[in-house]
């Protein structure tokens, strides 16, 4: 594409394709050059302005990001997205008051709840937890159709500040008022995992699976927990195997299968799955699992290499 543009520089569609490919490849500096050339040709193009804003944020050029986002708002393009990112830019530059004003201007679209989440976080950090919860209480009254989502934001806030008792009290009340709400049930289950309450995790994940029998995430979460924290390995294997059939490419599920096979003393099969998971998603937890199984299998050199790679 670059060679074609040298031969035919006046090909904006070709240049736009190159810019998109560079962006996707995370070649941000090169992508920004191409989008800037396009911007000079099409100064009001919303896609180009938004891409330049995102690239400016990525490179911490917040002044340019504000310019591009401001133009989007003035030309009535991607307004909620632009307002949300103006809020993020203000937050990143330490202007809390401006961030709150910008986030408050997001009045719809996918970004609305994300903006509300940022407002709640900023209030809790810069004012108080109670002020943040009071803000959410008002929002729930004003937007009853979004009560579940606001309850989830409140749960996430309480979890972040480790208010364990308040968290479970809040989630119990929210789920009682909204019986069968899967996101809230799943969040309470994961909160049970965080605070070593296996009884809560198991009860809520089983309830999720009653409501949504093909919920692969719930199957995997329950199966992995049973494999990791109990000796109910056969039950765990059945759950993880079914989850993996539903999402065969999911690295977390592949890791879970490797871990339960290890618990079942099927070491070679476990290594095969864990190596697949590590190749797709080489994070610390997968590395710890693979390293442990290799070590217990007597393959200590390979285990050390895996741990070293994860640390680097």
Question: What spans do the regions from the language model cover?
Answer:
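Structural signature of tandem alpha-helical TPR/SEL1-like repeats
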Residues: 2, 25-37, 59-71, 93-102, ...
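Residue-level recognition of tetratricopeptide repeat
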Residues: 11, 20, 45, 54, 79, 88, 112-113, 121, ...
């Amino acid at each position: 594409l670059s060679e074609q543009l040298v031969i035919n520089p006046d090909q904006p569609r070709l240049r736009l394709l190159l810019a998109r490919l560079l962006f996707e490849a995370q070649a941000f500096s090169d992508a920004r050059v191409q989008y800037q050339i396009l911007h000079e040709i099409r100064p009001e193009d919303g896609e180009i302005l938004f891409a330049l804003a995102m690239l400016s944020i990525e490179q911490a050029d917040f002044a340019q990001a504000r310019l591009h986002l401001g133009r989007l708002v003035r030309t009535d393009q991607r307004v909620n997205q632009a307002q949300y990112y103006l809020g993020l830019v203000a937050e990143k530059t330490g202007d809390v008051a401006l961030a709150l004003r910008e986030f408050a201007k997001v009045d719809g679209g996918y970004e609305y709840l994300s903006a509300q989440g940022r407002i709640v976080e900023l209030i809790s950090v810069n004012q108080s937890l109670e002020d943040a919860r009071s803000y959410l209480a008002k929002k729930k009254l004003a937007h009853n159709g979004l009560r579940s989502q606001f309850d989830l934001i409140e749960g996430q806030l309480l979890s972040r500040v480790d208010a364990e008792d308040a968290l479970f009290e809040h989630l119990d009340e929210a789920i009682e008022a909204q019986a069968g709400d899967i996101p809230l049930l799943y969040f309470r289950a994961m909160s049970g995992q965080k605070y070593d309450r296996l009884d809560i995790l198991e009860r809520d994940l089983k309830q999720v699976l009653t409501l949504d029998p093909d919920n692969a995430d719930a199957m995997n979460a329950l199966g992995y927990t049973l494999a990791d924290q109990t000796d109910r390995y056969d039950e765990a294997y059945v759950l993880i195997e079914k989850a993996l059939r539903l999402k065969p490419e999911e690295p977390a599920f592949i890791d879970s299968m490797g871990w339960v096979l290890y618990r079942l003393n099927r070491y070679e099969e476990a290594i095969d799955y864990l190596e697949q998971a590590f190749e797709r998603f080489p994070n610390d937890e997968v590395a710890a699992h693979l390293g442990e199984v290799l070590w217990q299998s007597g393959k200590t050199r390979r285990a050390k290499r895996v741990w070293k790679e994860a640390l680097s």
